[in-house]
A protein has these predicted regions:
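Rossmann-fold NAD(P)-binding glycine/threonine-rich loop
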Residues: 1-17
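Predominantly a Rossmann-like dinucleotide-binding segment in NAD(P)-dependent oxidoreductases
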Residues: 16-19, 24-117, 123-124, 255
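A general structural signal for well-ordered alpha-helical segments in protein cores
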Residues: 4, 27-30, 82-83, 218-219, ...
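Hydrophobic residues in well-ordered beta-strands that form the structural core
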Residues: 18-20, 137, 163
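Aromatic/hydrophobic pocket-lining residues that form π-stacking "cages" and hydrophobic walls in ligand
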Residues: 7, 33, 247
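Glycine-rich phosphate/pyrophosphate-binding beta-alpha loops
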Residues: 80, 138-147
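C-terminal glycine/acidic-rich active-site capping loop/insertion
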Residues: 109-116, 124, 128-129, 152-153, ...
Length: 268
C-alpha cells in the first residue's frame, strides 16, 4: 500500500496521464455484459460472481512470482483485476472483505535458495458493498481441464448475465421469460428463454493477450494520449483493487472479516 500511495503523490501534479492496466473490462463478452448490466437489462444488481479455474502460475524471471513477499500475494498479483471488475460492475467501493484460502497443491515440491514457495493456489473471497450488494471470487489454480476457465455472473432482481471465456459466450436469462411457477419443485434451470450469443469485437486486428482486450486497451490509451483525455482507469481505482486483495489476505491470515477502511488510507 505504501508504494501505491507514493505513486499517487508522484502523479498528482503530472500533466501526463497515468493509466492502470486493468484489461479485463475490455474482453468482448465482458465489455458487452457490463454495458447490458449498466443499461438495466437485469434490473438492480445484487450479486456478482467471478470464477477462475485455471493452470498454475507460469515460471517468471528470477522466480519472483513464487513468493508473497515479492508479489503481495496471489490475491493481489493475480486477482486485483477481478476486484476492479466487481467495483466497475456495481459502481461502488467495497466496504468489507471475507476470505478463506491456502496453498493446497501447487509449487510445494519446488525450492528456491532453499525456500519453498508460499503463494496460495485457491481461495474464496466475498466482498461487501455499501448498498448491500455482494461480489464473490472463486479461484482455483490447479484446474487445467476446464471447458471455460473464467465464468462471470451478474445477477439482478430481473435476471442474470453470464460471460464465459474462452468460449466468448454471453448469456442473458430474464426471470420473466422463465414464467410463473405452477408447481413448487418445478426445475428453474431449464434455460427457457435464455439468449445465448458469441461476442467478438471486429475492431480487434490482433487478439494477442486476454482475448483482444489488451489490443482494445492500448487503442484507448493511445486515443487518450492524442486527445489529452483522462485515463479510463486511474491510480486510485487501481490502488483500491490492490487494497481489496490485501484485505483478503489479511482475512485469510486472521480468520476474520477485514474492513477496507483499515487497509486504505483515509480519503481513498
Amino acid at each position: 500500500m505504501e508504494d501505491g500511495v507514493e505513486l499517487l503523490k508522484l502523479a498528482k501534479d503530472r500533466r501526463a496521464i497515468v493509466w492502470v492496466a486493468q484489461e479485463y473490462r475490455y474482453m468482448p463478452p465482458v465489455a458487452e455484459m457490463i454495458r447490458m448490466a449498466h443499461a438495466g437489462e437485469v434490473g438492480r444488481i445484487h450479486q456478482v460472481a467471478i470464477r477462475e479455474h485455471r493452470e498454475p502460475f507460469y515460471p517468471k524471471v528470477g522466480d519472483w512470482n513464487r513468493f508473497s513477499a515479492n508479489t503481495g500475494g496471489t490475491l493481489v498479483e493475480k486477482c486485483c483485476h477481478y476486484f476492479n471488475l466487481m467495483d466497475l460492475i456495481l459502481g461502488q467501493r467495497p466496504t468489507k472483505i471475507y476470505a478463506s484460502g491456502g496453498q493446497r497443491v501447487n509449487h510445494l515440491d519446488e525450492r528456491y535458495a532453499g525456500q519453498t514457495p508460499d503463494i496460495l493456489d485457491s481461495a474464496f473471497v466475498v466482498v461487501d458493498y455499501p448498498d448491500g450488494a455482494r461480489a464473490m471470487l472463486d479461484l482455483c489454480m490447479y484446474a487445467e481441464n476446464s471447458v471455460d476457465n473464467e465464468h462471470i455472473t451478474v445477477i439482478g432482481d430481473e435476471g442474470k448475465l453470464e460471460s464465459l471465456l474462452p468460449a466468448l459466450t454471453l448469456r442473458l436469462g430474464k426471470r420473466a421469460d422463465w414464467g410463473k411457477r405452477e408447481v413448487w419443485g418445478q426445475a428453474s434451470g431449464t434455460g427457457r428463454g435464455v439468449a445465448v450469443r458469441r461476442v467478438w469485437d471486429t475492431n480487434i486486428r490482433y487478439a494477442g493477450q486476454h482475448f483482444g482486450a489488451s489490443y482494445i486497451e492500448h487503442q484507448r490509451f493511445a486515443a487518450a494520449l492524442r486527445s489529452g483525455g483522462p485515463a479510463e482507469i486511474g491510480l486510485e481505482e487501481g490502488l483500491r483493487s490492490v487494497a481489496t486483495g490485501i484485505a483478503a489476505h489479511r482475512s485469510i491470515a486472521s480468520g476474520q472479516a477485514v474492513w477496507m477502511a483499515d487497509v486504505l488510507p483515509e480519503g481513498l
